[in-house]
A protein has these predicted regions:
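Hydrophobic residues within beta-strands of alpha/beta enzymes
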Residues: 5-7, 71, 159
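Conserved beta-strand edge residues that scaffold enzyme active sites
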Residues: 6, 11-13, 77, 143-144, ...
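A generic structural signal for ordered alpha-helices
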Residues: 7, 37, 104, 108, ...
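Metal-coordinating catalytic core of metallo-dependent amide/deamination hydrolases
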Residues: 12-142
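Active-site-adjacent C-terminal substructures of enzyme catalytic domains
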Residues: 44, 136-200
Length: 200
């Protein structure tokens, strides 16, 4: 039996504790494996945020780790993909992130800028890393056929959580596997109001 532990390398939120927790989590998993305490094989699924300039530096120490077997390329900037409605994003995250309206506006503007100016190169570098390692890669929160076509052209094999029927259909047509979340199927809909897994 195999488990893929999905851990974030980079984040679109100002939550440094996620990065701080990464090394202890991976060390703990390795110690448990070495002690024979795990009942199945644990491999690493690297969830890579393309809007974060720290993603690749955080990932680099683990590129030779034999547990690294899968990579997702994520873009959680508002205005597209998971969060096409910026106002919904603002209202959803203001309380969660304990920000004022002005602080949230600055946060949104920064993420939108990162998505436009930084993400394309970070994404290209991650694709190169994935191919160099010979591991499968997944796109994430594909919203449009163009998102899926980009993923296909980069050699990605899986579309995680397509957010629209158009993206899911294009993924199927291009030979990418669609993956939806169990909670979405149980609830009958996405947390963000995107397409229900039951429709696919």
């Amino acid at each position: 039996t195999t488990v893929f532990d999905s851990l974030a390398f980079g984040t679109s939120f100002r939550r440094p504790e996620r990065k701080a927790a990464l090394a202890p989590l991976l060390q703990g998993l390795q110690e448990a494996a070495d002690a024979g305490a795990l009942r199945c094989d644990h491999f690493l699924h690297a969830r890579c945020e393309v809007t974060d300039p720290e993603t690749i530096p955080v990932l680099k120490p683990y590129l030779d780790d034999p547990r690294l077997r899968f990579m997702s390329l994520m873009n959680h900037a508002p205005g597209q993909r998971q969060s096409p409605d910026i106002e919904v994003y603002r209202q959803r995250h203001m309380a969660d992130m304990n920000m004022s309206a002005e602080e949230m506006d600055k946060h949104v503007a920064e993420l939108v800028w990162r998505a436009a100016e930084l993400a394309p190169q970070i994404r290209a570098d991650l694709v190169e890393i994935g191919h160099g390692l010979g591991i499968p890669m997944a796109s994430h929160d594909d919203e449009t056929p163009e998102h899926v076509a980009e993923a296909g052209s980069e050699g990605q094999v899986l579309s995680e959580f397509p957010t629209t029927m158009a993206a899911a259909r294009t993924s199927h047509e291009l030979g990418l596997v669609n993956l939806m979340g169990g909670p979405n199927a149980v609830r009958g809909g996405s947390n963000y109001g995107n397409i229900s897994a039951r429709m696919l």
